[in-house]
Amino acid sequence: MKKKITITAMSLLTALFLLPINGFAYTINNEFNLGVNEGSSQVANNQYILLHETANETATGRNEAQYMQRSWTSAYTAYIVGDGGIVYQVGQPGYVQYGAGSYANANSPVQIELQHTHDKATFEKNYKAYVELARDSAMKYGIP
């Protein structure tokens, strides 16, 4: 009997780990999307999802999104996650973004920035959205 309960419990745990994780839903703020003739028109190769951390001690996610919208000719990514789990879209996923070197840019259909913060609660919300967005992006573009 004990063996049967153990096997049942292990089967249940295994099944739970194989299910998709969608307990946290993020929303995308499109306020800072690049305009029609802004950003690269070159389609990126589906090799990597590029993950960055801003390393900016004082900027909010919103500030970073505004900066990238203004500076798109030199640096921008598809998304910036910050301000308690808000996902700001700047560039168009699937196209080259200018968040890394030329090889990484050409081979990353999605680049995501994470707001730097020392606040634990903000970090936890940001990180949940960051990981979920990275996972969803990898699935969308067939990246293991």
What are these regions (language model features)?
Residues 107-144:
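Long, well-ordered alpha-helical scaffolding segments within enzyme catalytic domains
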Residues 2-106:
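N-terminal catalytic cores of peptidoglycan-degrading enzymes
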